[in-house]
Amino acid sequence: MVLTKPISKTITSLLNLRERFNLTPTSNDQFSPEFTQDLPELTDSEIAALDQIRNRFLRHRERGSLAEGTINHLVISPLLALAGLYDEPFFVTTEPEVELFLEDRDEILRGRIDTLIIQQQLWVLVVESKSTIAFSVA
């Protein structure tokens, strides 16, 4: 019998995500070269904006857990704006439902994509960002 579970209650931490899907973090630059090669250099103002986003997040996170809306205001929206993903030719949609069928577990994980930006083959998405543990900008 297939069990249907909410993603936000089933995957509750990065450790849980790694264990559940057998994921291994890597800092190897060759892991996804299509995302790291031939990138333009960040300008001084872009670096300053990223530093400001990180510092705001860290200052607020120091006081405890942050709600999804707070994370969206402090981190997600400023990053999407800085990347130009609110402008032409991109389109933003929110809250489409997603289901992940895990055959080896006879399980369906169901949730919502918090933010989805689409432009042809480029998709930028934020999935179930309810409990953020860390934040990193490279």
Language-model segments: residues:
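A short, conserved, highly charged catalytic patch centered on acidic carboxylates
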Residues: 2-3, 7, 11, 15-138
